[in-house]
A protein has these predicted regions:
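Active-site metal-binding motif and surrounding structural segment of the metallo-beta-lactamase
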Residues: 78-136
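NAD(P)H-dependent oxidoreductase Rossmann-fold/reductase module
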Residues: 9, 16, 23-31
Length: 140
């Protein structure tokens, strides 16, 4: 029987372009089921808050950026009463600007920040990568 996984592995190596995708997490949001699934219950509901870094030979790209550092420092000051319903739980060390350094990326070298949408839990990179071009969705 032929090993199909071996063929996939060989093609991956053959077509390696130097592009790498990293997934990180900036904590989670604690809420209730009713706020996620249209009034379906009072049970607790926790949502992980991921974000992504693409290391590319032509420049690194951040997608979203997770929660902003302010969510870890003073969530009520930054999010106001939204934090009473969607409680951001985040450590300072989970901030995207610090996490990129763990994979040898200099925040000043990030070329683009792509915003899939501008909810509070996707805005962690905004304003913290000064040399990046920020690219929001047109609808935003």
């Amino acid at each position: 029987m032929e090993n199909k996984n071996k063929d996939i592995f060989e093609h991956t190596i053959k077509f390696n372009t130097g592009v790498r995708l990293y997934m990180f997490q900036t904590g989670s949001i604690k809420t209730k089921v009713k706020f996620i699934k249209m009034n379906q219950g009072e049970e607790p509901y926790e949502i992980p808050v991921p974000w992504f870094l693409i290391k590319h030979p032509q420049g690194d790209v951040i997608i979203d950026g997770g929660m902003p550092i302010e969510a870890a420092l003073d969530k009520h000051k930054h999010w106001g009463s939204v934090a009473d319903v969607y409680d951001p739980v985040m450590k300072v060390s989970e901030w995207c600007r610090d996490q990129v350094k763990t994979v040898n990326t200099n925040p000043e070298d990030v070329r683009n920040v792509i915003q899939t949408h501008l909810h509070l839990d996707h805005s962690g990179a905004i304003g913290h990568f000064p040399n990046a071009t920020h690219i929001p969705q047109r609808i935003e």
